A protein has these predicted regions:
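Conserved metal-phosphate-binding beta-hairpin within the catalytic cores
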Residues: 1-2, 47-75
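ATP-dependent carboxylate/phosphate-activation module, predominantly the ATP-grasp catalytic core
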Residues: 1-37, 74-89
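Beta-strand scaffold of nucleotide-dependent catalytic cores
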Residues: 1-12, 64-71, 79, 130-131, ...
Length: 289
């Protein structure tokens, strides 16, 4: 059986950023044909298990599609399929591996609502999506109706260069695409990851784009929009808050040495030099706490 399609045209460096289900680009007739083509592909190689068949769809002739590859596993974006089908794909995969039959037939598969996933990357979009590394200082993940977050983030985690820069997935589901987009926008605004650069602000710019909102998307849109995006620059106030945060963390170490500036007769000021790039005052300054 097949569980519908996913739209994955929004990509950077040929890697997906935003995925959604169902696709806004397919007609019902094309949707049925592409689903059957996926089933036929699996049957042709006697494949048993959960898998993902990927197709390229013509931008000029959206009723035409071409086989690209088959991945014999679940994909990163499988949560959007779970959200609109109500099927736990991991559970089904394990059942199949254990020799059990599928728990449902094709006629029992129903697609309800719309679900969109945003991949949170440790990277700097305005620097050509260069990866970002560092130690996570604080994490706050969004909650609310229709919001699901798949991540392993925690305070103190070290983000290095050994693995893919994806650090979390934010999935928003609604009764329709507009509601799913609105919920995703709010969830991205609520997500906080301190200590590294992320693409959170970029993702918000992307899903607010008029063509994205209208469903006019293709694999070239990400590169076309990036040069015109304006990102918030850190201000002196942000740097001051960061210094306060570092100071509060330093006052609770695991050893006996406290950087509290203790002197006979009272504590001395603790000074931090903050270097930061900012549009309003690109400089460095000292702050005493």
């Amino acid at each position: 059986i097949h569980l519908g399609e996913r739209e994955c045209s929004l990509q950077r460096r040929h890697q997906k950023i935003i995925e959604e289900a169902p696709s806004v680009l397919l007609s019902d007739e094309t949707r049925a044909r592409i689903g059957q083509a996926a089933v036929d592909t699996a049957k042709s190689v006697d494949y048993v298990g959960a898998g993902t068949v990927e197709f390229l769809v013509s931008d000029e002739e959206p009723d035409k599609f071409y086989f690209m590859e088959m991945n014999t596993r679940l994909q990163v974006e499988h949560p959007v399929t779970e959200q609109i089908t109500g099927i736990d794909l991991v559970e089904e995969q394990i059942r199949i591996a254990a020799g059990e039959p599928l728990s449902l037939s094709q006629d029992e598969v129903a697609l309800t609502g719309h679900s969109i996933e945003a991949r949170v990357y440790a990277e700097t979009p305005q620097a050509g999506f260069m990866p970002s590394t560092g130690t996570i200082l604080h994490v706050s993940e969004p909650t609310g109706p229709g919001i699901r977050v798949d991540s392993g983030l925690r305070t103190g985690a070290v983000i290095g260069t050994e693995f893919d820069p994806m650090i979390a997935k934010i999935i928003a589901t609604g009764t329709d695409r507009d509601q799913a987009l609105a919920r995703l926008d709010q969830a991205l605004a609520e997500m906080v990851v301190l200590g590294i650069n992320t693409n959170l602000e970029y993702l918000q710019h992307l899903i607010r784009d008029a063509d994205v909102a209208a469903g006019n998307i293709d694999t070239t849109l990400v590169e076309a929009r990036l040069p015109d995006m304006v990102f918030d620059a850190p201000t002196r106030r942000h740097a001051q808050i960061a210094a306060h945060f570092v100071h509060s963390q330093a006052r609770a170490p695991s050893d006996a040495w406290l950087p509290d500036g203790f002197r006979l007769g009272g504590a001395a000021e603790v000074k931090y030099r903050v270097n930061y790039p900012a549009d309003d005052d690109p400089s460095s300054f000292e702050i005493a706490l």
